[in-house]
Amino acid sequence: MRTTIHKVITMMKGLIIVLKHAFQTPVTLRYPEEKRILPARSRGRHYLTKWNDGLERCVGCELCAIVCPAQAIYVKPAANEPGHIHSHGERYASDFQINMLRCIFCGYCEEACPTGAIVLSNQYELSAYTREDMIYTKDRLTEKTPGESGRDPSREI
C-alpha cells in the first residue's frame, strides 16, 4: 500500500513538471528562416580592412600570426616598392591566410594588430564543401563593403 502511494505521488510530480513546461514558449529557432541575434561583441568571420585612401591597413608585422594560439594565421611580408605602394608602412602583407578550420575565434589577432587591419565580425555562417575553401586568402579577407565587419573601417589610429 505504501509503495503504491509513493508511486502515485512520484508520477504526479513528474506530470506537474511536464505540464509546467508544456505551455512555455520554445527556446529553439527555425534556423535558416530565423536567425539568432548575437551580442554586439561576439566574434565570427575575419576581415582585412583598408584606409580611406584605399591602401591596406596591414603592414605585414606578423603580430597576429605570433599571438595566434592555434597558429591559424600565415603572413608573408614584402617591402613596399616606390612605384607600387600597398600600405602606409615600409612593408605590406604580400600573402595573408587564415585557416578557419584551426581558428578558435579568440580575438587575439584583432587585439594585437597595431593598425586595426584585422577585425572579427559577428557573421557565423562559415560552412564550405572542401577544406581548401576554409583557408581564407587575402582576396577573400579583404572587406568589400564598408561596415560589413561590424566596425567602422574609416577609424583612424
Swiss-Prot record:
Gene3D superfamilies (alphabetical): 3.30.70.3270
Catalytic activity from the UniProt record: a quinone + NADH + 5 H(+)(in) = a quinol + NAD(+) + 4 H(+)(out)
Annotated cofactor note: Binds 2 [4Fe-4S] clusters per subunit.
Predominant location: membrane
GO CC, any one term: plasma membrane
NCBIfam families linked to this entry: NuoI (TIGR01971), PRK05888.1-3 (NF004537)
UniProt record similarity statement: Belongs to the complex I 23 kDa subunit family.
The protein, known as: NADH-quinone oxidoreductase subunit I
